[in-house]
Amino acid sequence: MNSLWMGNLEPYMDEDFICRAFAQMGETVVKIRLIRDKITGKNAGYGFVELADDTAVERCLRKVNGKPLPGATPPKRFKLSRSNYGKQGESSTFSLFVSDLTPDVDDGMLYEFFHYHFSSCCSGKIVLDANGHSKCCGFVSFESEREQKRALVDLQGATGLGKKALRLSLASSRVNKKKESSENQIWQYHSDSKNASFINQYYYPQNLSYLSTYDWNYSLDYLNPSQNTTPVDVTQSEQTEDDDLEYPDSEINVTEANETFMAQSEELYSALIGCFFQPPESWDGVTCSASSYLPEPINQYEMEDSCSSNWVTT
């Protein structure tokens, strides 16, 4: 399309104002489409400018972009870029960050310098402060990743743009950042799922029957809110309903439990005591796996003899 995206517009800037501004820059506008606020009806700060051909688009990006906007109050600059209006999806671009620029370099000069060396350069943008003055740095975008990397090497320290040698570094476009962020989060979700499966396999007690019914090898395929929510065809996995799960009864009758414990203790004590009074003839074939640390019982007759002897002595 032979159109440009134009931003940095004030509410009073209408179609006639933009046509006059381009005419003073030596360009003829074919059509203008301003995006307006649905409530106030004023322009939303940006729009689309259609030119005669692609040559005019290239010329505006080189000669007009970044220049002062005629008749603008307060002072504004042309803010132009290639238009994606009417295209499906977002085009992927590869960017470089350019620093050590001088204040006289504008968007058009930045774009023209890099486009002269690499034809896939599609835009140049100077970073401005709140007052519209250059921060002496900017960004250039390429349609080819190969030429982006070549420019990083070939034009590192190059001169001819401003009064200083250029310093270049890689920069990620918003589209690539958004894609990379969503991929990293999906990877992180799957990684957390695998870690949870490993930990549950080796560190959770397996003798708890009420926990053994759960499947620890679950997958966390959550949708990141920042991702594109375009509907896609997916095969939904079967979900296990927990209506039939039995949960342990947490209520305990303490009194009844204590009585049961005491009764079992009395039975054990009686059984152990009874073992000492069994005649040796009944020990054949009998084994006992319980160990007793109770003191040996004193015979009743021995106790009476001991008491009698003590009384006589007295």
Curated annotation (Swiss-Prot):
- Alphabetically list the UniProt keywords: Cytoplasm, Nucleus, Protein biosynthesis, Repeat, RNA-binding
Which InterPro entries does this entry report, sorted A to Z? Answer: Nucleotide-bd_a/b_plait_sf, RBD_domain_sf, RRM_dom, TSAP1, TSAP1_C
Q: Which GO terms describe its cellular component?
A: cytosol; nucleus
PROSITE patterns attached here? RRM
Q: Please give the start and end residues of each transmembrane region.
A: none
- Main location group: nucleus
Q: Could you tell me which residue ranges the RRM domain spans? A: 2-85, 94-173
**Classification via SUPFAM superfamilies:** RNA-binding domain, RBD (SSF54928)
Q: Which GO terms describe its biological process?
A: mRNA splice site recognition; translation
Where does the UniProt annotation locate this protein? Nucleus; Cytoplasm
Pfam families this protein is in?
RRM_1, Trnau1ap
Q: Could you tell me which cysteines form disulfide bridges? A: none
One Gene Ontology molecular-function label: mRNA binding
- PANTHER family in the record, alphabetically? TRNA SELENOCYSTEINE 1-ASSOCIATED PROTEIN 1, TRNA SELENOCYSTEINE 1-ASSOCIATED PROTEIN 1-RELATED
Summary of the function given for this chain in its UniProt record: Involved in the early steps of selenocysteine biosynthesis and tRNA(Sec) charging to the later steps resulting in the cotranslational incorporation of selenocysteine into selenoproteins.
Question: Which family is it part of?
Answer: Belongs to the RRM TRSPAP family.
In its UniProt entry, what is this protein called? tRNA selenocysteine 1-associated protein 1
- Native organism: Danio rerio
Give the encoding gene's name.
Answer: trnau1ap
